[in-house]
Amino acid sequence: MVANGHFAGSADGQHSSSYEHGVQVIDEDKEFNPNVSKYLTYENVTPAGFNYHLISVFGSQSTGKSTLLNNLFGTHFSVMSETERRQTTKGIWLSKNKRLELRKDRDPQAKMADNILVMDVEGTDGRERGEDQDFERKSALFALATSEVLIVNIWEHQVGLYQGANMGLLKTVFEVNLELFLKDNKSTPRSLLFFVIRDFLGTTPLQNLQNTLLQDLNRIWSSLSKPAGLENSTINDYFDFAFAGLPHKNFQPDKFMDEVQKLSTRFREGHRDPNSLDRKGTGSIEGGIFLPEYHRRIPADGFAVYAEGVWDQIVNNKDLDLPTQQELLAQFRCDEISREALVAFDEAISPFELKQAEAVQAGYPEVLGGLGPAMRNARMKAVKNFDTEACRYHKRVYQMKKAELQDKIDTRLKALFLGQLGAAHRSGVQEFSESVSAAVKAGQKKGASYDFAEIVRKQRKLAIEKFEQEARSTLVEDAPWSNYQQELSLYQKDLERTSGQLRRDEMRRLATRVERWVRSRLGESVDLEFNALGSGRGGSGAPEFGDKPSEKTIWDRVWTLFVDTVLDAERRFTERASSFDASLDEVDVGLWRLRRKSWGVLRAKIDEEMMEGNLLLKLRENFEDKFRYDDAGVPRIWRPTDDIESVYSQARESTLTLIPLLARFKLAETNAPPPLDKWIGHTPSSATPADEEDLTPIGGVDDDEGKSLEEEMTLIGEAKKQDITVRFKKTADGVYVEAKRSAIGGITQVPLYFYGLLFALGWNEILAVLRNPVYFLLLFVCAIGAYITYQLNLWGPIIKMTEAASHQAVEEGKRRLREFLEASDTGRQAMAMSGARNATEEHEMSRLSRKPAERGGRKNRADEDVDDDDDDF
């Protein structure tokens, strides 16, 4: 787009060369140019912050405003052709001061201020707009809202005129200024009206012209309808005035340029003379014309947005509220700066967030290395970048947006921080558990000399130190969430829970080792007691030394052995548990579980001994000890004269008394079951469901079991007792019959006549042997050999050797016969037929010859492996 003979720069994507002559801020159609910010960036004004100044020029059309600016600031605004009298500047144009490049050799004290922006405003009273003064009013309001200095370009001969001296325009400026001040009642921003009197001849002193203009301005101000509260205000409350005169450009060109050069030195920072200050703080200006109070306090990087917002309010005929516009600008720019700061923050923090999220999703939170420094640096840089750019804007908005930015940053950093502590928490607890377990195993290998409580305390201290170190390395200074005491407290509680669980597990393992020890001791002791049944009569099971145990007190002895063994186990358990730093409640629960488990071991052992096969075997052994041996333990040799029936009846009845005795666990001393319920005790109040889930219910102890103590102590039911009694009697009857047969067998004798007959018939053979020395000697040698063989118990081996030799001879004969038959066809056919028939017969015979399974013997009991940890038991 081309305007005023130059590129307006309103089209998107303009090249930087398009901005060499400035940029059209507002075109003749009242449209704001969105590329103003690009122009400021091109001129390197954006980073200047508050170090810039904005000047606007007013005046009638075709009065040389653009010419003045071009000569004064080195700009390239379009000027009117000398051959035509028409509008040249359309809308509002903006350009940066270029005079600095032309004045490098000037005095540094008199050089112009940096970053001076000049706005060339469309002239007033032009024929193109005619009586349409809407744009004049809007452009005046826009210039007043944005500019520090308003240059009024008038001719000397127009001073004293109303229209010619732009008094109508100035009245508009004053009116809109009052509107602005009415909205902004918290401050009173001032502006400088700089009157540049063109074609100044010097005939009328400049001071007189100045007085005339000030009189006209005061008169206009007095005629204004002022809002409430400003009735007594004066023009000097809001404006400062400066005046300068310039010779005719065409008639006095050299002098014109000299005066322009002098005028340019006034466009620099100045200050008020402290000696001339009045009660309102105003006074004469020294140095340059740019005072801090003129500046609108809009940072350079936000000027384009601010100007666009102001113009939007003006062009839409809305009340222009500069404080609101400044706040809106501050919000807009602070949001932009915040987003830019968050971009750099994202680049630094997003990789850590991604890693943490992946680790959490995988179920294995990971402690991220270098997270703390990255968080601190990212937060510091983001806040610093925001402060650098945003601190120039509205203070309240800046502080609010800074707080919002910090909230966003801290929300993400807090999530990372908590995630890091969560990962450190989980890994720390896991490492603590593994370290304790490893130390316990190492102690067990050294001979069970480890102190579990000391191991836990040491590893717990190391775990807490590591957690605190990780937490401190992740802290972010000045962050409200940067405190890990709550997480540390949770971590310590979790370590306590883990320690308690490890202690309970270790006590469970200790209880298991003690139970194995109890099982081993009870197994041996109970075996000895049941094996001693019947030894009271001095049979084969009688002890070699000491008193012979009574069968009636077997349960008393078993109970005493059981109680003593468990008491010893409890003592060992308590001593070892004290090294675990276990509480009294935990020890009570452990002892209670040990007693219940031990009773289960004893009951299982008794049930094993009371199995039908084992019990019948014990009854038979008991009966045979009483029947086959006398009271002195000497085996009986039955004779026909012995009273076998009486001995049999006594032994059988004595053995039958064992069945009811063994059927019920009852103490002979009290004739009642042992006090199992009192011995085990009540369930400890600290016991948990987990402590009871693996325990076998005990009748008379557990109310919900539904069995009484009497039923718990019943080992053999009535039906089983009757069956065992019948079967035992049959076994005893068999022993009795065998004894009876052996006694009767000794009564049979050879008749006497048989010896006479044998002597008569064998007389010739007797004489032959006696008369022949060889036969006699052979008979004598055979007799001696037979005697020696008998004395040496060699008849058995000789008979076996003979049988083996005969068997081998028979097998060898069969083999040779088979080879002979296989050599002929007839023999092979006969063998095949014989084999088929024999297979059938063997199958039938195998079914008939199957032996029934032997009655259940004593169950093999495998020796239980005892761990190295059981050595102390």
From Swiss-Prot:
Its main location: endoplasmic reticulum. This is Protein SEY1. It is a multi-pass membrane protein. GTP binds at G59, S60, Q61, S62, T63, G64, K65, S66. It is found in: Endoplasmic reticulum membrane. The chain crosses the membrane at residues 750-770, 774-794. Keywords: Coiled coil, Endoplasmic reticulum, GTP-binding, Hydrolase, Membrane, Nucleotide-binding, Transmembrane, Transmembrane helix. Belongs to the TRAFAC class dynamin-like GTPase superfamily. GB1/RHD3 GTPase family. RHD3 subfamily. GO terms for biological process: endoplasmic reticulum membrane fusion. Signal peptide: none annotated. Cooperates with the reticulon proteins and tubule-shaping DP1 family proteins to generate and maintain the structure of the tubular endoplasmic reticulum network. Has GTPase activity, which is required for its function in ER organization. Residues 771-773 are lumenal. CDD domains: GBP (cd01851). It comes from the Eukaryota.
